[in-house]
């Protein structure tokens, strides 16, 4: 029996981040219990407020170096009122690690882990049932990283949006490979503002060319971002598939999409530095929710982090079967009504984690 060893750097961060990472590790260890040939080597490091308290900086050098040498990074959450908005802030650690690891693509799925949760959506259940898309957001270009002029008292300020062909090419390839991981391949939706912005016209032209030349079996449809925002509320299933867009549009549309499933405690995310064509992309995985400093102990929903770990298994660790088993285990547990308070249940964080770990072992035995 050949041993598969995967090195995972854990960055629990602050407040509930510690709890949710513990539950995700519990799930990963449950895989090794029934499949001893799969071994996870965990290495804990500090980030965010916890790192500031211990070292004075939000991301210690040793944490960054460990992340660079790992197969993947699993992060909890950072921040909290304790650290305020001073010169050194917890969130700076997150921004730095994303930049240093060159995480250029952010993936945020929008779906229902169980149909039992449809009534939690602020939209009508018959409108949202069947919603299943992933927003692929370009993470290191665009207006957030463009030239900036601050108001110096003159009453003028500006931000500039720019994209290069290589930047658009690589995010398009990311979307294409994610599409191809499904049989049949998923449709691709590209969101832009090509009727106004020059950068969007370059974006649209480049997306079209890459799909046509490199992925002729795939389909891509273009949608103006303002129209897409309306579709997302009126009929979100129309965007099912892979949704690709630039940094600012992706920031906004993924936050809009995040309210559809009814709780941030359900939503995973991945930030990748390379293509998942061999299911071994390097990535950082984290829940979409924050550190929730006011939440009592053992009340946080761990599912977003557990589903982030499932994404990690499939995209970075080449353990697709195991990742699918984790997602199925989450569905089974929710179908049984085992859930935390944000979903209307009365189970604790650890009870939900224990139940999912049990189902994972049954599925993989």
From Swiss-Prot:
Keywords: Amino-acid biosynthesis, Branched-chain amino acid biosynthesis, Cytoplasm, Leucine biosynthesis, Magnesium, Manganese, Metal-binding, NAD, Oxidoreductase. Mg(2+) binds at residues 226, 251, 255. Its cofactor is Mg(2+); Mn(2+). GO terms for molecular function: 3-isopropylmalate dehydrogenase activity; magnesium ion binding; NAD binding. The keyword Heme does not apply. The keyword Translocase does not apply. The record marks 144, 193 as: Important for catalysis. NAD(+) binds at residues 80-91, 290-301. It is found in: Cytoplasm. Pathway: Amino-acid biosynthesis; L-leucine biosynthesis; L-leucine from 3-methyl-2-oxobutanoate: step 3/4. One of its GO terms (cellular component) is cytosol. It is an enzyme of class 1 (oxidoreductase). SMART domains: Iso_dh. InterPro entries: IsoCit/isopropylmalate_DH_CS, IsoPropMal-DH-like_dom, Isopropylmalate_DH. One of its GO terms (biological process) is L-leucine biosynthetic process. It comes from the Eukaryota. Substrate binds at residues 98, 108, 137, 226. It catalyses: (2R,3S)-3-isopropylmalate + NAD(+) = 4-methyl-2-oxopentanoate + CO2 + NADH. Signal peptide: none annotated. Binds 1 Mg(2+) or Mn(2+) ion per subunit. Its EC number is 1.1.1.85. Catalyzes the oxidation of 3-carboxy-2-hydroxy-4-methylpentanoate (3-isopropylmalate) to 3-carboxy-4-methyl-2-oxopentanoate. The product decarboxylates to 4-methyl-2 oxopentanoate. Homodimer. This is 3-isopropylmalate dehydrogenase. It comes from Candida boidinii (Yeast). The gene is LEU2.
